[in-house]
Amino acid sequence: MKRFTIILIILLAFDFTSAYGWGSKGHDVVAAIAEQHLTPKAKRKINKLLDGKSIVYYSSWMDNIQNSPYWENGYNKTKTWHYANVDKGHTYQTMTKNASGDVITGLEMMTKEMSENYRNLTDSVKVDYLKMIVHLVGDLHCPMHAGRLSDRGGNGTKVMWFRQETSLHSVWDSKMIESARSWSYSEWVDNLDRTNRKYKKEIMSGTYEEWFMQTVEEAAKLYDYVESTGEIIPSLSYQFVYDFSPLLEEQLLNAGYRLAHVLNTIFK
């Protein structure tokens, strides 16, 4: 019985870390940046769908519904939509696809439905798709949600994070953003969203798959860093935070701008 309990705890821990990209603060940052760049028309339509609540309010909804009535009534099928795995030497196209879907197929399906079949969707479906798009565009930019299949998106790569054992996946899900700055999500937004129009335009161009492959490239740098230490369980602390804070900031900012672009396109 004791052995079963230990195994169950391990499995639950894996499920938890594999879904919570950026943590709630990171998702709030992405949604808040996007909200600042919505067109007036998109704002009105979103405000109506969400009954006056903001997309920030629902940015982590897709994580929070696990083990809820929503989850038991079919949304457990979206469990694999939070990520896609790409092994070293592969691209998204050359990897065997998850039969349950992934972050790209989920986003593509919902965006197409919201753009081309909007009038035929029920209000409840529109609302749920909106909440999930807000969340998954954030996950699309979280490096370990584009990690290798061989180590389950960084879950199998153990590291010491300020002398505490964890996984590379967990570092990027929430620990990195909490260690980089002691800011609230609104302070993150105020300090990140200061770029020029040209940068925004360039970042907003592209497809979900192209954006995802950019995240894969960034994930590769993290794997290279960890492997270069030569340690069985690499020790990561202040130097790692210093070296990769710019990547953290860039991914959050880009996700916010791209989410705004997606929503403005849907609600044009």
What positions do the PLM features span?
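Bacterial Sec-dependent N-terminal signal peptides
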Residues: 1-25
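Residue-level micro-sites within transmembrane alpha helices that shape
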Residues: 2, 14, 138-141, 257
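N-terminal, motif-rich segments that launch catalysis or mediate targeting to/interaction with membranes
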Residues: 20-136, 143, 148-268
